[in-house]
C-alpha cells in the first residue's frame, strides 16, 4: 500500500535535501513547491511553507532519514550554524589547521573518497605557488600534477569507501550523510594521531550537513573529534587545507575510477547523467546484474533507469 508522510522542516534542511536528491530531481514542480524528486518507491516534494511530503512504498523510511535533527525550530538551526563552537574564527585562513573534504558522492560509478590534510601556516604561500584551489576548478591532469607534489609536502590521511562496502552500509540504514560523517571523523582522527605531538590550531570540515546532525551521526563512535572543530560551506575558499584535501580526494577518486574501468573492461563515465544509465545497462549485459554492486552506488535512481533500458 502506498503511504504519504509530511514533515515540517526549514529552508536549510530543504536545501540539504535538494542537494542529496539532485540526481533524482523531476523537471516538474507543483505550485508553491521548491523541488520534486523521485527515488525508487518514493516521491519527495518540498514546499516553500517548509513542508516536505514523502509518497510511496518507502515514504516512511525516506522521511525517517530527515526527521532526526531536521524538524527543529529556526532558532535551533541558527545556533548550530552560528555557534562559536562551529563557525571558523575570522583569522582561520592564516592558522595551522587540518582540513577535510570528500569526493565521489554524486557519482553513480566509483567509490567515495575522503581526505584530511594538515597545513602549517608557514606552508600556505607554497601551496598557493603549487596552484592549490578547489578541485572542482581543476581538470584531472591538473589534479594529478598538483596532487603528486602535495603528497610530499603535507601530512594527510586518505580513506576510500569502495562500492561493495558502501552498498552494504547503506542497506543497513546508513544514509550518505552518515557515511560521509564517519569517514571525515576517521580521516581526521587518523591524521591527528599521525601528527602527535604536534597539535593543530583547529580542524575545518567542508560542511555537508548541520554540525549537530554531523555529531548525531557519530553518536556510537568511540573516538569523535570535537575540540576546535569548525564547519564551513565552500571550505576550500576559507582555508587551503580544505582545498588541498579536495585535490587529494579527487586524485584518489580518479585513480580508483580508472582501476574500476579496467575491471569493467570498458570506459565508465563520471556523474549521474543519461550516459551513466547507458553504461550501467551495458555493464549488466556484459558481467551480469549480480556484479553491479562492485561498481555503482545502488540507491541512485540510475540503477532503476539502467534496468529499464534493458527491457
UniProtKB/Swiss-Prot annotation:
Subcellular location: Cytoplasm
Residues in coiled coil: none
Enzyme class: hydrolase
Note describing how the cofactor binds: Manganese or magnesium. Binds 1 divalent metal ion per monomer in the absence of substrate. May bind a second metal ion after substrate binding.
Sequence ranges assigned to domain RNase H type-2 in this UniProt record: 95-311
BP GO terms, sorted: DNA replication, removal of RNA primer; mismatch repair
Keyword terms of this UniProt record: Cytoplasm, Endonuclease, Hydrolase, Magnesium, Metal-binding, Nuclease
UniProt-listed Pfam families: DUF3378, RNase_HII
Any GO CC annotation of this UniProt entry: ribonuclease H2 complex
Binding sites annotated in the UniProt record for a divalent metal cation: 101-102, 206
EC code(s) of this entry: 3.1.26.4
Functional summary from the UniProt entry: Endonuclease that specifically degrades the RNA of RNA-DNA hybrids.
Annotated PANTHER family: RIBONUCLEASE, RIBONUCLEASE H2 SUBUNIT A
Protein name: Ribonuclease HIII
Gene that encodes it: rnhC
